[in-house]
Curated annotation (Swiss-Prot):
Originating organism: Bos taurus (Bovine)
Compositionally biased spans, kind Gly residues: 14-23
Signal peptide positions (record): none
Start and end residues of each stretch annotated as Necessary for GR/NR3C1-mediated remodeling and transcription from chromatin: 180-515
Role according to the record: Involved in transcriptional activation and repression of select genes by chromatin remodeling (alteration of DNA-nucleosome topology). Component of SWI/SNF chromatin remodeling complexes that carry out key enzymatic activities, changing chromatin structure by altering DNA-histone contacts within a nucleosome in an ATP-dependent manner. Belongs to the neural progenitors-specific chromatin remodeling complex (npBAF complex) and the neuron-specific chromatin remodeling complex (nBAF complex).
Residue ranges constituting the SWIB/MDM2 domain according to the UniProt record: 290-367
Similarity comment: Belongs to the SMARCD family.
InterPro entries with a match to the protein in the record: SMARCD1_SWIB_dom, SWIB_domain, SWIB_MDM2_dom_sf, SWIB_MDM2_domain
Protein name: SWI/SNF-related matrix-associated actin-dependent regulator of chromatin subfamily D member 1
Cross-link (Glycyl lysine isopeptide (Lys-Gly) (interchain with G-Cter in SUMO2)): 101
PANTHER family the UniProt entry points to: SWI/SNF-RELATED MATRIX-ASSOCIATED ACTIN-DEPENDENT REGULATOR OF CHROMATIN SUBFAMILY D
Gene: SMARCD1
Length: 515
């Protein structure tokens, strides 16, 4: 029978139906000698008989090695009516290879996904290979060597750009900061009282306090910064508190607070307005918004490491450097640290694991101190506006980091490169087609008769592949073709298949179930 996908082909002695061309079969005489040729009629709807699967000892002439013929009728059963073996008596039963069974649907899906991935991977490889001119074209057109040199240079350039992109990606994983000056302006204005003689009503005296600021421009970066949006003043801080004189404004109205939330909208400054006609002392507390977060160290640990406020990774790195410098690591158990007298006072332990240091540091780290500015709100009418300036150091993202991000996210150049690559691939494909046409015409010009014969043979092979035709029709049309040894077994298989088919039809008609 014909081999199904995923199964091993088993050659039973019973057989499949007939198909194919005309011819004659040999009748068997006494002793198994061939008798005179007997003309066989075709099966209903079929041509003359064609063996579904010749035995291994009798290969059919004109067939390609490994090819199989289409089976006819149901699968073979036993020659008797009560047995269940799948082969005829007297023949050895072939076992099916378990590894060749039909795979489960999940396995089929996995295989299909893997095939898609392999096709995508091969497509990328093929896309690179498609840009290379064949050696034959380079021999015919010497100028094509210039193109190959450019292609080699492009590969080197692509490798260099890829390395740079990887370096930039690694650099962006680390915080890139630069110190800039943040100038804070604190100013106040005084509005004296006004009386309205007609209505008998007026306005009371009041003052207004403004807190605003900006980053000082860097001459080297001013040209680049002019093209990007400026940061709002409030974006530098986590919270702001203005504390007024408690004796003047009472315990419930002397504090003005602002705290950042998830829905906070950034602003360029803060202003506070209160009634009053006397000078007011106020304290402005600014809590910087450190990114990444920074912590103030315990005074003892700060003196030991020489760090006042820093991020957690920097603090752990500094502590590790102190341990290595003073050789405090246990020589036998390297994961332990032997504390000296200073670390014993800080961590209250003589020996600890290095993995315990982050947890032990948690109790020694505190929120950073706020920036405290004392200011006097003047209500002197002669001094309508009084401004004080304060400069503080602020760590901001390096402008180079923004340029790096822009470079990595830029797709304009990639689209242009992809467009040019497509044009190159189309040009190379056209060149290959012209090369094939040239070789076709050149072969015909050198030997027209031999070329036509070879071409017809090639077309004949292609036709057989396209139409799924097997065998050799020229041999099958001759009577000698059916006098070969394989015809005896083919006849038995054909008639046995027909008997089994009629038997099943009869059982279905009579309602007989074969148990």
């Amino acid at each position: 029978m014909a081999a199904r996908a995923g199964f091993q082909s088993v050659a039973p002695s019973g057989g499949a139906g007939a198909s194919g061309g005309a011819g004659a079969a040999a009748a068997l005489g006494p002793g198994g000698t061939p008798g005179p040729p007997v003309r066989m009629g075709p099966a209903p709807g079929q041509g003359l008989y064609r063996s579904p699967m010749p035995g291994a000892a009798y290969p059919r002439p004109g067939m390609l090695p490994g090819s199989r013929m289409t089976p006819q009728g149901p699968s073979m059963g036993p020659p008797g009516y009560g047995g269940n073996p799948s082969v005829r008596p007297g023949l050895a039963q072939s076992g099916m290879d378990q590894s060749l069974k039909r795979p489960a649907p999940q396995q089929i899906k996995q295989v299909q996904q893997q095939a898609v991935q392999n096709r995508n991977h091969n497509a990328k490889k093929k896309k690179m290979a498609d840009k290379i001119l064949p050696q034959r074209i380079r021999e015919l057109v010497p100028e094509s060597q210039d193109y190959m040199d450019l292609l080699a240079f492009e590969r080197k350039l692509d490798q260099t750009i890829m390395r740079k992109r990887l370096d930039i990606q690694e650099a962006l994983k680390r915080p890139i900061k630069q110190k800039r000056k943040l100038r804070i302006f604190i100013s106040n204005t005084f509005n004296p009282a006004k009386s309205d003689a007609e209505d008998g009503e007026g306005t009371v005296a009041s003052w207004e306090l403004r807190v605003e600021g900006r980053l000082l421009e860097d001459s080297a970066l001013s040209k680049y910064d002019a093209t990007k949006q400026k940061r709002k003043f409030s974006s530098f801080f986590k919270s702001l508190v203005i504390e007024l004189d408690k004796d003047l404004y009472g315990p419930d109205n002397h504090l003005v607070e602002w705290h950042r939330t998830a829905t906070t909208q950034e602003t360029d400054g803060f202003q506070v307005k209160r009634p009053g006609d006397v000078n007011v002392r106020c304290t402005v507390l600014l809590m910087l918004d450190y990114q990444p977060p920074q912590f103030k160290l315990d005074p003892r640990l700060a003196r030991l490491l020489g760090i006042h406020t820093q991020t957690r990774p920097v603090i752990i790195q500094a502590l590790w450097q102190y341990i290595k410098t003073h050789k405090l690591q246990d020589p036998h158990e390297r994961e332990f640290v032997i504390c000296d007298k200073y670390l014993q006072q800080i961590f209250e332990s003589q020996r600890m694991k290095f993995s315990e240091i982050p947890q032990r540091l948690h109790a020694l780290l505190m929120p950073p101190e706020p920036i405290i500015i004392n200011h006097v709100i003047s209500v002197d009418p002669n001094d309508q506006k009084k401004t004080a300036c304060y400069d503080i150091d602020e760590e901001v993202d390096d402008t180079l980091k923004t340029q790096m991000n822009s470079f990595l996210l830029s797709t304009a150049s990639q689209q242009e490169i992809a467009t040019l690559d497509n044009k190159i691939h189309e040009t190379i494909e056209t060149i290959n087609q012209l090369k094939t046409q040239r070789e076709f015409m050149l072969s015909f010009a050198r030997d027209p008769q031999g070329f036509i014969n070879d071409w017809l043979q090639s077309q004949c092979r292609d036709l057989k592949v396209m139409t799924d035709v097997v065998g050799n029709s020229e041999e099958e049309r001759r009577a000698e073709f059916y006098f070969q040894p394989w015809a005896q077994e083919a006849v038995c298989r054909y008639f046995y298949s027909k008997v089994q088919q009629r038997r099943q039809e009869l059982e279905q008609a009579l309602g007989i179930r074969n148990t």
